[in-house]
Amino acid sequence: MAKYKPAESDRSSIKSKKPKKEVSASEGIIRAELLRNVTAAASKILLPLMLIIVSLLLFIGPFYRGLFFPLELLVANTIIFGLFFIWGLFRFVKSDSRFIGSPLDICLLLLLFSYLVSFLGFAVNKRDALEELLKIASYLSVYLVVLDICRHWSIQLPLRRSKSNNVGIVEANEKVPPGLNLVLHIILASATVIAVASLGVAAGHWDFIGAYAANRIASPMGYANTAAAYLMAAYFLSLALAPLARKMLKIVYLVPAVLMMITVILTFSRGAWLLLPPLAVLMVIAASPGNKIRAVLYMAASTIPALPVAFWIDPIFRSDMPSMAWLPIILAITAALLLGLAAELFLSLENRRKRTVFIFSAAVFIIIVIIFIIIPLVTPISLETKPGEPEQLQSLMQVVDNIKPEGHYKLVLDVKAEMDLTTDTESPDFIWGVKALGEIPGYRSVKLLEHHGQSTSGWETVTFDLETGPETERLSIELYNRYPGTAVTVRSVQLLSPDSDTRLHFIWSRLLPDRFYDRIFSFSRDRNMDRRFELFADAIKVIKDYPLFGLGGGGWAAVYKSYQDQAYDSREVHNHYLQVWIEAGIIGFLAFVGIWVSFTLAFLKKCFIMKAPPSRWQHWTAVFMPVAALGAHSAIDWNFSMAAVGIFLFALLGAGRSLDYDDNFESSINEKKEGSIKKYLPGLIGVVFGLALFIYTLILYSGLQVTWRSQELFEGGNIKQSLVEIEKAIALDPYRAENYHNYNVLIEGQAVRMQNQAELSKMLALAKRAYELEPYNPNYLSRYGTLLLNYVDTREGLNYIDRLMELRPHYLSGYQQPAWSRLSLIEYYFQNDLPGPAMEYYKELYDIEARMQADYGNTRSIAYVIGRAAYLNGDNNEALRYLERVGETDSNYNDAQEIITTITGEDN
């Protein structure tokens, strides 16, 4: 049989097919070992590096004014995006494909996406929108990094319990992420440092800008309310971590808790004070089984000493020796530790003995309250300044609500006043005093009564008549004593009217120091609340106009003055949920709300529905409580505008997300084929975007530095070099409108002097670009409108300038430039014998006046403009009517008087 000879094509086909090289078992083992070594190296180098960087951000960030201002924020963003690049490398070598695995992940990505969309197509301040977008991206980066640190860290803290105790099961069997405890302790330590630093500023040891202002602790972040929210969240973190520690190490967590509680109290943040009680109840509900009683006892152990010590040290901080405040603080810490020790001993007792101890402790507590609080409160009021003591005002106050306007009231009190003067002491003007103030709209007070009394012969009944005005809303009654050697005792204080008999006990004023009573009950409380509601109402107006995509980061600051019903300054909404809606639209708002909703649902599902083991449950509590505290406080303030607080929050979210895993999801990850490209995708994203954003933020940082340098050169008179630097700044940071504005201002003189059309066009283009980047900025709008008016088209320029009345309806500047621009045109046309156009602009002045009267309520500031225009038009009577309204403080007063003199001289 003839042998088969393949065709030429078959031969070529056979030659081209090389047999696959089989990998021997030993080579496979070597490759696997190499992969394990690379992965181990990544864990040993990259993971600790990420932990160090996150720790530095948590510890150092708040000291740089909370990373609120542009320079500090850019530096932080650059570091964070470098951190994100490292995270990408870590994910790549770990071949970890996990990326979106929970509703929280989706909410965070949607939040970032919504800010990106608003920046690209709807931002009214491009530079601020870019800054906010980068800030959200940095928050997400911190979240992902902390999540992986919790997942992959392997070194355990010695503080963690190693065997079963009254919390429950051995922790190793409860699937708690290995790095979670470490991360939470780093977060707690960073907040403890801030608490100590804040108290140290008040004690006079060191100083940070705005850290202790208006006798309120504001922390190195410089804003008291945000400091209160931050430390309140850390307070609950500290108490939630305590049950996870070994034996008596639990009480150590009371030390930071006491420091934080004292600091929160001394921030004088009414919002934080208001939220503490409901959050305390939530803490008990959220605590793991077996730790609910401990939660109550530990909150009591930290609050009972902290509250009186805060009252004690507040005046010490304001004295000549503020450092003496540390002694009461140390006493508070000692008392808290003793109470914590007592709590642990109580929890270790059998149930029968617990009941006995509880009944005994409750009885002792009631007796103490009766002796030290109830009895003093039912005794007569006593105010005394002893002989030899310095002159000082001692007072008690009570605010009375539900006061009838135009009502007749009688203030009746029994008084006993005494005087005991030393031989070298002059007789005082009075021994005691009583004052009544009536609150009227506008947060103003009207004095209805002030009486200075002398000594009495025993008890005397004194009666005062009070007549409230037509707008009086409530009364403030104050009793006081001032001079050494004088004392007054008052009992049975009554406020009588035909309809009611109100007894005044001054209970809260007797319990609380003056500053605390004033902070809680004074008229300023209503002013603060009313302003908050006014902000919220104006925010809703903005949302109604831009509900879908928002206005980009900085949107509220750009437009709020166009929506307000009265003038106020507030670049933040004081409600971060509404602010996100304004900036990122409905998707951003839902995503932001979804962060708390999804996190809460995950906590409820894992702990209350699936019944997580006690230790894992308590870890959930440790991350849930501070997140809930920050979320609640952010409904009344702008905490997350400070990047340091945002980093704090997103580190907590990342830590909490590490607890929210699904066994089926985890196993599906582990079963992925080794060669799948998907497992490298998150790492590639981190490497590419991390590196790109790192470089981009470095460029923006350089642009900011060059911008400032150009301004310094301009102020120093070096115009030529300033222009060179501005061009560099524009190239580095093309969204910064101030550079375009400064550039066109600098070149105007030369362009006009040389009548260079190219330079004039360049000047207009620069002014237009500045306006386009920030169309709600009155300076850029005014500048562009003025240039159009002077060099292009008068009517077009006026149309832009007239927009100032829309942008600033409650500010003088919004009306003055439109009016003065028309006066300039009127003067020009009359000088050139063109009365027709002059009359057109003259009539428009009255339109501006009518609009100003309707929106601003007072047109006196443009009276000179209209009066001069009337004078130029020959209408002397009209000119006098307006010019006589020009006040002496007006810069045009002398000119107005000259015109008046001229007119009256002509008439004579």
Model-derived regions: residue spans:
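Hydrophobic transmembrane alpha-helices and their immediate junctions
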Residues: 249-252, 586-621
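Extracellular beta-strand ligand-recognition surfaces/modules
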Residues: 426-432, 460-497
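TM-adjacent membrane-interface loops and short helices in multi-pass inner/ER membrane proteins
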Residues: 223, 418, 513-573, 577-580, ...
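Membrane helix-loop boundary segments at the extracytoplasmic
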Residues: 59-68, 576-584, 619-649
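Transmembrane signal-anchor hairpin modules in multi-pass inner-membrane enzymes, especially those
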Residues: 1-188, 238-254, 276, 280-394, ...
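Membrane-interface alpha helices of multi-pass inner-membrane proteins
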Residues: 256-268, 629-635
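Membrane-interface segments at transmembrane-helix junctions in multi-pass inner-membrane proteins
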Residues: 206-241, 271, 319-329, 452, ...
